[in-house]
Amino acid sequence: MKQVLITGASSGIGKQLACDYAGNNWNVIACGQNQARLNELENHHSSIQSLQFDVTDIESTKTALSQLTELPDLIILNAGTCEYINEGVIDTALFKRVFNVNVFGILHCIEALQDRFTERTHVVIISSSASFIPLPRAEAYGASKAAISYISQTLALDLQHKNIKVTLVNPGFVKTPLTDKNDFAMPMLVTPEFASQKIRHGIEVGKKEIHFPIVFTLFLKTIALLPFTLRMAVIKRITGK
């Protein structure tokens, strides 16, 4: 039976991916911090096994992942968080919290597992389309996602000689407990079910980058191609800033 390891599996996209893979006869190792939520997943799906640890703690991450007797070929690094600064007011403590999860949390998992990677290994890194262009108050979140997107792409280059695949995922707005906290309009908001289907299909067909919803993400990618002054003018217009 196929196996997948998913971090951030206790809610949102990660939870939906865990449920959908389990429903398609995969063995799922669901990783997260909240043991109660992980227990709920295990109780609903016999093919889900939980693994509780904090991705921001390298020793906790290494200890937990060392318990795996066999490394799944598919590894989905999905754990993430989001916080926004007050307009133009830098809060380094907030930046550290966001980067500790969105960047170092992913790096901790890779460091803990990389010695066991094989030519069958496929690493999927969940970033965000927020990395495409600057957005108001998203200094910490957008920068963390831009960082992990860059890391993902360079890893894809550096690991290709070992036949280790790396896929980057850039979702738009997905309805999750994180986005439920947003105090602004979220155009083309999609469900976790939609996100899971797009991610799983993209993985299955071997895409190097998965982004959705396509109209929204292509719109952002197009803006990113504009000359700087024009790009900033367009962003100001569409965000009302």
Residue ranges and their predicted role:
Residues 10-11:
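Conserved glycine-rich cofactor-binding loop
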Residues 45-59:
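Rossmann-fold cofactor-recognition segment
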Residues 110, 144:
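Active-site helix of classical SDR
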Residues 24-40:
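Conserved glycine-rich Rossmann-like NAD(P)H-binding loop of the short-chain dehydrogenase/reductase
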